Amino acid sequence: MRVVIATRIFGPEISAASGILRTWAEEFRERGCDVTILTAKPPRGAVIDDPRGIEVRRAPVKRDRQQYVRGYLSYLSFDIPLAFRLLFSRRADLYVVEPPPTTVAVVRVVAALRRTPYVVRAADYWSEAAEMVTSSRLILGVLRRVEAWGLSGAMMLFSAHQPLTDRFRIAGIMTPAVPIGFGAETKDFRYDGQAPPEPPVFIYAGTHSEWHGAGIFVEAMHQVLHQHPGARLEYYGNGEDREEMQAKARGLGIEKSVEFYAPIPPAALSTILAAATATVASLAPVPRNNYALATKVYASLAAGCPVIFAGPGPTVEFLRQADHPYAGVAVGYDADEAATAMNAAAAAPLPPPDRAELAKWSSGQFSLSAIAERVVDESLAIIRT
């Protein structure tokens, strides 16, 4: 059986999607499938390390200033060539698609022409996320129709969690869906006995865009420094909000305590997380985030690092109901509340034995490999039907 994965983002480009799709591809390979990945050429200077036994085909794509495939001109620079790459390649038994909606729509057209089923990794409802960056009714209306049309043609949606599936149903998208949850790649993220730092260090790892609202921790850090003068806040990742956050740090006079870094490979990030006082994660208080989950918490927990989350959505329930006393805390999207939680973590950092126990618990509960097995089980059932 031949499986083709269509995704604008894949290793060595650093993102949650890259790691997730790699585990899916490897699981398809282990089940005896012939796996091909159609993706984009990576950013300049990236070192390619493709998974064994999987063919990865890359094509040029338009990237933004941060070398990221973001925005609809960039998406179309991937989607239009993708249509021809799919049309004129050897026929597949299944397409696996990573959004944006335009990519899913392209795959629906080709899938119909080639009579090939497709499934979608549905981690977000893009139409609502777009409300953060445009108020144009025309653009939002077109996007909703394109997204609904693409998702409605799939044989299966692998949704991030049940609240997102429920949101699809409200929007009239009735495609069969399996909430698969989230996890971390436990081969990369682990705890190796690091002691908590002194002075305290807080890590934000991942994208910081408008709907993440990660600048809340810059404001909180201004208060934290009153109690812990040597504390640091470090951002690893990229996003549209970076310049605004840097300006905010300068305006508060704390620019030397707030540092920004490019994305780094998971294994390197794991070492940093394992040695941090806590990780911080946030989602802005907007309607679409009522069902969005801050997936970066899973990597943190796998590395034995507790989480401080600020914002709405399922992450709050996850942390408050986690079956582990050291998983972390959830607070409102408020700088004062975030600062209080950060000060508490700095005053009583989690010791190594408790960090080791947290990492062990997390790796047993939230493994990307286990999720990949479920995805492939469902996908192969579709092929065989």
Placement of each model-derived feature along the sequence:
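Acidic donor-binding loop of glycosyltransferase active sites
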Residues: 155, 273-290, 305
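Carbohydrate-associated surface elements
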Residues: 41, 163, 182-183
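N-terminal subdomain of nucleotide-sugar transferases
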Residues: 1-55, 224, 385
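Nucleotide-activated donor-binding/catalytic signature segment of Leloir-type glycosyltransferases, i.e.
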Residues: 243-270
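Conserved donor-binding/catalytic core segment of Leloir-type glycosyltransferases
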Residues: 158, 195-221, 234
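Acidic anion/phosphate-binding donor-loop and adjacent secondary structure
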Residues: 169, 183-199, 213, 349
